[in-house]
Amino acid sequence: EGKNGQPPTNWRSYFGGSVWEKVPGYENKFYLHSFAKEQPDLNWENEVVREKIYEMICWWMDQGLAGFRIDAIMNIKKDLTWSDLEPDGPDGLADVYKVTGKVKGIGDFLLEMKHRCFEPYNALTVGEAMFVKEEILPQFIGDQGYFSTIFAFEPCHAYRKGKNYMDYDWPQPFDDWKKETFHNQKIIEKAGFEANIIENHDQPRGASLFIPEEDYGFYSLSALAMIMLCQRGLPFLYQGQEIGMSNRRWEYAE
């Protein structure tokens, strides 16, 4: 339910604007979308919904899949008090990640999914779980963790200056990336191993982010690849990375 026709809370979606969209045909009913309005969040508090999700996962496992990359999984649990947050921008909204992921109870969902869907198939699972604190890493990865491993996002986020995808230093200061990489490698040692990345679909090409344009070439790209491959963990390559693909700016009309 909304507040006199207004959204229930002042939460901002990852793509900007309110996380709330009016349900067609209703004046004061809203649905929540952490990302695009075309992607309504599923209600994981509903046991029937969870059962259908598990049914679909197991169907795919029965087809012979070896595992899953589990995208945006830290958003499945919400703060059910539905409270407004202190605005963190001129739009009067606050980022939705502040009320997801860190909310008590998400582990219950993740453990249930592991026991029901992944353990019976000995599946490999790679969770997109950002900003997991050092003290709870063993809950997330390894033999007793929710996932086999999670992506090592922290080094790739060292370039961020603001809240948005485009708020970054480019090329990234090497010392910042080096510091985050060494720190991340150290804290993960006792918990298990991570999935190491240079880039993915949410971030700039590593060749452009880490290498100044005047230094772009075979040797600098080879060095970047070796830095990733020589880290402890499981290396993940994003399509195009194998040929050293760089960014390109496109002009387009609305």
What residue spans do the PLM features occupy?
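Active-site and adjacent substrate-binding regions of carbohydrate-active enzymes
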Residues: 1-254
